[in-house]
Regions:
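Non-ligating segments of multi-cofactor redox enzymes
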Residues: 1-103, 109-112, 116-149
Length: 149
């Protein structure tokens, strides 16, 4: 019985030593959303469709990003630019551009595959929802963060 009491005290001292050692360290918990989150330079967040310096969409509807995506979460429909209304600088543009974030693995292959740098990773990460259909981001939402001239 005396041996059991000694083992119990030794175990308590060992456990409390870990607690007391870490009590004086700086906490690693982020106070989000009260304090802004600091992102690493190469953070892969929610995608952003870019515009060029004239305010036209950079996406030319080439489908390379959709072909490179291992999760098959990118859906594109291309249309031809007309002479009176130009959407992008190329001959075609993406009339429909959807990303299904319930499937996206944020691998970055779509960004690497894009020849016009039309799609990039932003720093957005807030997409929690109870509606699965809200996880499909359409072209308009992906263009929101891109500056318009």
């Amino acid at each position: 019985m005396l041996q059991e009491a000694g083992e119990t005290i030794a175990t308590l001292v060992k456990g409390f030593s870990v607690t007391f050692r870490n009590m004086l360290r700086k906490p690693v918990t982020e106070n989000y959303p009260e304090e802004p989150v600091q992102f690493q330079p190469r953070y892969r967040g929610i995608h952003v469709l870019q515009r060029d310096e004239n305010g036209l969409e950079k996406c030319v509807g080439c489908f390379l990003c959709a072909a490179a995506c291992p999760a098959r979460c990118i859906y594109i429909e291309a249309a031809e630019n007309s002479a009176d209304q130009r959407i992008s600088a190329g001959e075609r543009y993406a009339s429909v551009y959807n990303i299904d974030y319930s499937r996206c693995i944020f691998c970055g292959y779509c960004v690497e595959a894009c020849p016009t740098d039309a799609i990039t990773h932003g720093h957005g990460f807030e997409m929690a929802t109870s509606n699965i259909n809200a996880m499909i981001y359409r072209k308009e939402k992906l263009l929101e963060k891109a500056p318009r001239k």
